[in-house]
Amino acid sequence: MMGIGCWVHYWGDASEQEKSLLAKALVKHDIETAPLDQDRPSGPGICIFDEITGRLRDFLQFVSCAGRQRIIAIAKLEALRNGERGWELLQAGASDVLVWSDLDHVVRQVKARLERWISIEQLLAGACAAGVVAESPVWLATLRRISEIARFSDTSVLILGETGTGKEVAARLIHQLDSRPNKRELVVLDCSAIVSELSGSEFFGHERGAFTGALSERPGAFALANGGTLFLDEVGELPLPLQAQLLRVIQERSYKRVGGSTWHRTEFRLVCATNRNLLEMVTRGEFRADLFHRIASFICKLPPLRERIEDIIPLAEHFFSSS
């Protein structure tokens, strides 16, 4: 199929009139359709249903290849009267759940999602060609969310995950896919490795003579990341005084160098990562609640490798070939 294409499948009863109306609406919006090959299902696809059952959930899991393929589940109005919830279908493998009310409106929604998904899959294909390993459904789903937030938003991102889950890989992918014009560099700062006495200089930079050993002026992370992305790894290790200073820069987008009196403007995308539970730290008074809400506009939890069994052999081959 050329252009935007998908398969369409009716789960349950559907009149010929309903099928004809949907087919005409899809053609009107330049969406090509094909029958579902149930022997070798591939996405994207549309499944229209009138009742949520265990068999429907099993079907969605099968045709989505356990989440690998993009499926839109469209609920006819009678399906909603049962009090069922769409999240059951999302858990089963559907990428989105829509409601069949106004047909033209729902088809416009379908087209918008298909166009966005095509863009995201192209971005992911480029990332995988550049060395990102993604075979497991759970990791593919995570990378899709990362790609979508990176390309279609400039919001701050908080990456959560155990050590070794690929937090820096995710941060670099966000920076790589960021669509800002004239985007500059990715600046990486490991908060756990910053010497407390020099933390101000690391973030804000310093003027010549600001302290013993400051023989020349030096730009800090806020200056270097201007126009680009600032990645704060292990952000949970920041001491409270520095948290307050970071919060102010995020809010005001301006700072002073250590030993300086001039305000400097900075604009950057903020990506933070940690293996700690920041909400528990907030409860204990170890992490500022206002800073947490600033850095966590979008939260991405990375699955550990034990939940990505399909990626183990490809990862081993990748590391072997690059060694």
What residue spans do the PLM features occupy?
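N-terminal accessory segments that target, anchor, or regulate ATP-driven/P-loop NTPase machines
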Residues: M1-G126, R306
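His-Asp phosphorelay/catalytic-motif detector in bacterial-type signaling
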Residues: C65-I72, D154, N182-R184, E267
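Hydrophobic/aliphatic anchor position in the core parallel beta-sheet
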Residues: I71, V157, L186, T229, ...
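Conserved AAA+ ATPase "sensor/coupling" helix adjacent to the nucleotide-binding pocket
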Residues: R113, W117, H206, A210, ...
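Nucleotide-binding/hydrolysis machinery
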Residues: A125, A129, E135-V138, R151, ...
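Conserved post-Walker A coupling segment in P-loop NTPases
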Residues: R145-G213, A223-P239, P304-I309
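Conserved AAA+/SF3 P-loop NTPase catalytic/coupling segment centered on the Walker-B
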Residues: S196-S201, P219-R253, F268-C272, L278-D290, ...
